[in-house]
């Protein structure tokens, strides 16, 4: 399948940037700034637009460009259009449906990536994509944002964790270290699921997972080695 020329990602990137600006605008409104409201529910859409709109578009676009498959440009398109429709027509479900389809496409992209390379970092990012899809499905079926935001958080946390694992592969973590990481991720995801039924316990358990992930990274992230590198550029990139 032919790849898109380099100029084609630009419209998707514009949608992502506009999504970021809309999310920031909504965030400032939630902080109490007296800004003109584009729609009556803009402030309430801060989280969905920031995560599913801006970051959803950007992350899926990055993978589409890297994989060079035409069909992979559909998720960032759906995500970019989804946040826009959600803002313009806040009382209609079309925006949520588009964002949910975008996250389904994100899972499809990660499925292909895992098929090509079955590794700890790809599985971690795949779980993040599944969490994104789960959160959007719950939102579409009427769950409150304060409940589904845990799944959106997992999307970002596991995506970043997976990318850090990919960068740190040269350190070759032992099998025991990988098992420990998997156990920590299990704790984190269990807390997120539990939060749907018991918010306090779920918050505490997922919070424990959030603490353990960076603690695990203290020993296994290449950044801690490169930050002491003799070359300034390497330290800066870290």
Question: Which residues fall in each region the model found?
Answer:
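Hydrophobic alpha-helical transmembrane segments of multi-pass integral membrane proteins
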Residues: 1-238
């Amino acid at each position: 399948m032919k790849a898109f020329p380099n100029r084609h990602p630009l419209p998707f990137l514009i949608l992502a940037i506009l999504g970021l600006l809309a999310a920031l605008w909504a965030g400032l409104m939630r902080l109490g700034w007296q800004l003109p409201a584009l729609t009556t529910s803009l402030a309430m859409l801060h989280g969905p637009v920031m995560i599913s709109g801006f970051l959803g578009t950007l992350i899926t676009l990055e993978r589409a460009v890297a994989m060079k498959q035409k069909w992979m440009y559909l998720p960032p398109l759906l995500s970019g259009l989804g946040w826009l429709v959600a803002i313009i027509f806040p009382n209609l479900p079309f925006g949520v449906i588009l964002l949910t389809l975008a996250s389904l496409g994100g899972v499809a992209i990660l499925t292909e990536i895992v098929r090509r390379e079955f590794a700890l970092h790809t599985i971690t990012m795949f779980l993040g994509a599944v969490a994104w899809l789960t959160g959007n499905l719950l939102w579409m079926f009427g769950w409150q944002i304060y409940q589904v935001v845990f799944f959106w958080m997992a999307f970002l946390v596991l995506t970043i964790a997976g990318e850090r694992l990919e960068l740190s592969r040269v350190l070759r973590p032992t099998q025991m270290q990988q098992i420990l990481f998997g156990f920590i991720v299990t704790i984190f995801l269990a807390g997120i699921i539990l939060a749907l039924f018991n918010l306090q316990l779920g918050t505490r358990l997922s919070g424990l997972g959030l603490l353990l992930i960076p603690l695990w990274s203290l020993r296994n992230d290449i950044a801690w080695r490169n930050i002491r590198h003799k070359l300034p550029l390497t330290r800066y990139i870290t």
